[in-house]
Amino acid sequence: MLKRGLLFLTVLLLLFSFSSITNEVSASSSFDKGKYKKGDDASYFEPTGPYLMVNVTGVDGKGNELLSPHYVEFPIKPGTTLTKEKIEYYVEWALDATAYKEFRVVELDPSAKIEVTYYDKNKKKEETKSFPITEKGFVVPDLSEHIKNPGFNLITKVIIEKK
């Protein structure tokens, strides 16, 4: 009787341990690897295709630095319109990555712009395009003939305040 009980318990434990392993495998396989490519670090995945890199410094109304979050990359699609409202939304996500729900965006620096640098195959030289941040926004250009992963960079100061 004791041997049967131990055998039953062993089989039961094996079943539970295998079910937890298969759950972990299925959870890791649900990550959409098609949108990202693996970088040098195993925990870092670089977006494939165009992306917006937000690298901002949060300051108060007097220019004193309040927050300097790590940069964050957001996948974007060619043909998408990036308005000031959308960009502020991405900036708030970057702030939340460091201090979740503590700050809100008051205003972007008036001189803020988004830049992309790539090698133009037609002109055979480096090109830098700048896009102003406006209410109307700008359409993300398709640069796929020149570069696989164009990085549209927003590097600026942002006026923020506590929520």
UniProtKB/Swiss-Prot annotation:
Signal peptide: 1-27
Record bears the keyword Hydrolase: no
Keyword annotations of the record: Plasminogen activation, Secreted, Signal
Annotated SUPFAM superfamilies: Staphylokinase/streptokinase (SSF54328)
Disulfide bonds: none
Subcellular location: Secreted
Keyword Zinc: no
GO cellular component term of the entry, any: extracellular region
Main location: secreted
Function, in words: Potent plasminogen activator that converts plasminogen into plasmin. It forms a 1:1 complex with plasmin, which in turn activates other plasminogen molecules.
Protein name per UniProt: Staphylokinase
Source taxonomy: Bacteria, Bacillati, Bacillota, Bacilli, Bacillales
